[in-house]
A protein has these predicted regions:
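N-terminal Rossmann-like FAD-binding beta1-loop-alpha1 element of flavoenzymes
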Residues: 10-41
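Helix-loop-beta segment of a Rossmann-like dinucleotide-binding subdomain
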Residues: 95-116, 123, 151-153, 260-261
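Predominantly flavin-linked oxidoreductase catalytic cores and closely associated redox partners
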Residues: 124-285
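Conserved Rossmann-like nucleotide-cofactor binding loop
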Residues: 19, 48, 187
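Short amphipathic alpha-helical face segments that pack within enzyme cores
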Residues: 22-26, 116-120, 185, 212
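FAD/FMN-dependent oxidoreductases across multiple families
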Residues: 241, 267-316
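N-terminal FAD cofactor-binding segment of flavoenzymes
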Residues: 37, 41, 45-92
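Glycine/serine-rich loop-strand microenvironments at binding/catalytic pocket rims
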Residues: 1-14, 18, 129-136
Length: 316
């Protein structure tokens, strides 16, 4: 029997990304609509909500309109409307403008910092009395005697290298819940345990993965075009390697630039990071970044298999 402190909730959500926070918000909305008292807790491994969100993003607001209909009056970070789209095929020195696929039309959409958006969602969740706890990493899934999930435990903090308790040691806690929602994102360590234990991949197609590398740049004012969106395919990747790029113009002379490569590439010498560096030297990209400076960067694994590769989403 564990001697960890225990806290009881109706629902525990693991991961304070857009999906986890949206789920928590909707649960509290439904509980109020039905005059039910529902306790909801969200834990996040980052030191603050949004700390581990690295994606620049373009958001289509239909789902947000349904979740928070009055979001425009709540000081949301959705400020920069998309103004124009370019979809380019790159050769080593030139760019060819291609017809923009319908699913990539962004009229009426907004360019956002996904990190700022999740921070704002956390504020909306807390306004509905969701308990949001950043800085707590779920390290263990809790099961009852019937092998049903009953919550998660957070990891101990302050252990020394040899595993003993240091002067600032804090023991983890057990969060027990009637329902637990795992919103860890791609390759979450608890999600992998659940997929194996409950055979959640049994009837779906094999998942494929990519890596997304993103940087935030401050560029010269003359190179800044807030609301402008560029996507590319082609160089520096060869035709047998899946991938492409995005470049989003934010406000305050900021540009979010990223490069995605499928991890099923065949060339063992290919380095996604170095391909990204080559990409930034293309004339079409160089003219935007020249004279600027990189102020932030990150990378993230991505699910690329599509809806047919999603695992079963419910389990005991």
């Amino acid at each position: 029997m564990s001697d960890k402190e225990k806290m009881e909730y109706d629902v525990v959500v693991v991961g304070a990304g857009p999906s986890g926070l949206s789920a928590a918000i909707r649960l509290k909305q439904l509980s109020k609509e039905n005059n039910k008292d529902l306790s909801v807790c969200v834990i996040e491994k980052g030191s603050e909500v949004g700390a581990h969100i690295v994606s620049g993003a373009v958001i289509e607001t239909k789902a947000l309109d349904e979740l928070i209909p009055d979001w425009k009056t709540k000081n949301s970070p959705l400020k920069i409307k998309a103004t124009d789209d370019k979809f380019l095929y790159l050769t080593e020195t030139k760019s060819i403008k291609l017809p923009t696929p319908p699913q990539m039309h962004n009229k009426g959409n907004y360019i956002i910092s996904l990190s700022d958006f999740t921070k704002w969602l956390a504020e909306q969740a807390e306004a509905l009395e969701v308990e949001v706890y950043p800085g707590f990493s779920a390290s263990e899934i809790l099961f009852n005697e019937q092998d049903k999930v009953i919550g998660v435990a957070t990891c101990d903090m302050g252990r020394l290298k040899d595993g003993t308790e240091g002067p600032n040691f804090e023991q983890g806690i057990e969060l027990h819940a009637t329902q637990t929602i795992f919103s860890e994102g791609c390759r979450g360590h608890l999600g992998k345990i659940l997929m194996e234990k409950f055979d959640l991949n049994k009837d779906n197609s094999p998942q494929t993965y990519g890596i997304g590398i993103k940087e935030l740049w401050e560029v010269s004012p003359e190179n800044s075009k807030p609301g402008s969106i560029v996507h590319t395919t082609g160089w520096p990747l060869k035709t047998d390697t899946y991938g492409g790029s995005f470049l989003y113009h934010l406000d305050n002379n900021k540009v979010s630039i990223g490069f995605v490569i499928g991890l099923d590439y065949k060339n063992p010498y290919l380095s996604p990071y170095l391909e990204f560096q080559r990409f930034k030297h293309h004339p079409e990209i160089k003219k935007i970044l020249e004279g600027g400076r990189r102020i932030n960067y990150g990378a993230r694994a991505l699910n690329e298999g599509g809806i047919q590769s999603l695992p079963k989403l419910t389990f005991p």
